[in-house]
């Protein structure tokens, strides 16, 4: 398999790479499923984890919050919600980029069977005119908040309004400094929608569930948290029903994504990977393109009709 991967590694131009993917999609007659990662959203201003400008490159000490921390001591939730409060405006205002629009176009033309995304930014949904039933957000979405006790749900925008009301000093700073990203309060945005904070957040307040006084948590799968079984099973079925898999913008470092690639490979499904930088699935791919996603997907969508 390794020799086959090297033989099909595309080292040429954007046009060459797009041409290779045109052949890949056409060969599988609309039964290719996509798996997308953070690299798809970098052109929308949301950084990835491991890319050249990713959070791990910018901050070697970065550690995302763990599920057990969030449900543990109060201080962890204070820190999380303070960071999320400051990061939310940029996430909520982010716009789909060329990658999202190209993927939406490919699906509308029936060239792909569905899209499994690791991203929690909601940009795949914003790129389509009609709600896409074949989009699966395996790690959830930042746009909703759930009570972990009773299941009460509210939109993240409503949560932001509540946080503004009970933290007027921080809100006033944010209102007066909407573009300030490296000041005393906050530095740059992280992939999970929060920011690094450089101030004492011990007085930051956050609301509890209005129904049962339980803990409110963003509707995302934290590190150390199990993916819902229904989501896992749906992702497996999408892979099983497909004839091929195209991975875009993911290093496949997270097991929930890597296992989908391994599942496809275990049944002999052809795999193509478009990602700038190494991925854990490289040895399983028949086509490997080491480029960013936007230019290649835009060329692909403009070529294939």
Curated annotation (Swiss-Prot):
Residues 11-305 form the Deacetylase sirtuin-type domain. It comes from Batrachochytrium dendrobatidis (strain JAM81 / FGSC 10211). Residues 1-10 form a transit peptide. The active site is at residue 139. It is found in: Mitochondrion matrix. This is NAD-dependent protein deacylase SIR4. GO terms for cellular component: mitochondrial matrix. Its EC number is 2.3.1.286. Binds 1 zinc ion per subunit. One of its GO terms (molecular function) is histone deacetylase activity, NAD-dependent. PANTHER family: NAD-DEPENDENT PROTEIN DEACYLASE SIRTUIN-5, MITOCHONDRIAL-RELATED. NAD-dependent protein deacylase. Catalyzes the NAD-dependent hydrolysis of acyl groups from lysine residues. Pfam families: SIR2 (PF02146). NAD(+) binds at residues 37-57, 118-121, 249-251, 275-277, 293.
């Amino acid at each position: 398999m390794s020799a086959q991967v090297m033989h099909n590694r595309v080292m040429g131009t954007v046009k060459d790479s797009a041409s290779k993917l045109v052949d890949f999609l056409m060969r599988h007659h609309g039964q290719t499923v996509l798996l997308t990662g953070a690299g798809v959203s970098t052109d929308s201003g949301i950084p990835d984890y491991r890319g050249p400008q990713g959070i791990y490159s910018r901050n070697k000490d970065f550690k995302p919050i763990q599920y057990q921390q969030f449900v543990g001591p109060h201080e962890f939730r204070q820190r999380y919600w303070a960071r999320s409060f400051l990061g939310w405006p940029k996430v909520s205002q982010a716009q789909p980029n060329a990658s999202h629009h190209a993927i939406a176009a490919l699906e509308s033309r029936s060239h792909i069977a569905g899209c499994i995304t690791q991203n929690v930014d909601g940009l795949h949904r914003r790129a389509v005119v009609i709600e896409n039933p074949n989009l699966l957000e395996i790690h959830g979405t930042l746009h909703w908040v759930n009570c972990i006790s009773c299941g009460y749900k509210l939109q993240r925008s409503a949560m932001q309004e509540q946080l503004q009301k009970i933290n007027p000093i921080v809100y006033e700073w944010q209102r007066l400094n909407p573009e300030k990203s490296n000041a005393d309060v906050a530095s740059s945005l992280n992939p999970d929608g929060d920011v690094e904070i450089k101030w004492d957040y011990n007085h930051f307040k956050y609301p509890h569930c209005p129904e049962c006084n339980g803990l409110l948590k963003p509707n995302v799968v934290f590190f150390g948290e199990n993916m819902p079984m229904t989501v896992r099973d749906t992702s497996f079925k999408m892979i099983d029903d497909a004839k091929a898999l195209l991975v875009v913008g993911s290093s496949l470092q997270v097991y929930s994504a890597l296992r989908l690639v391994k599942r496809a490979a275990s049944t002999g499904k052809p795999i193509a990977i478009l990602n700038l930088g190494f991925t854990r699935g490289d040895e399983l791919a028949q086509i490997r393109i080491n480029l960013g996603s936007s230019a290649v997907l835009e060329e692909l969508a403009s070529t294939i009709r």
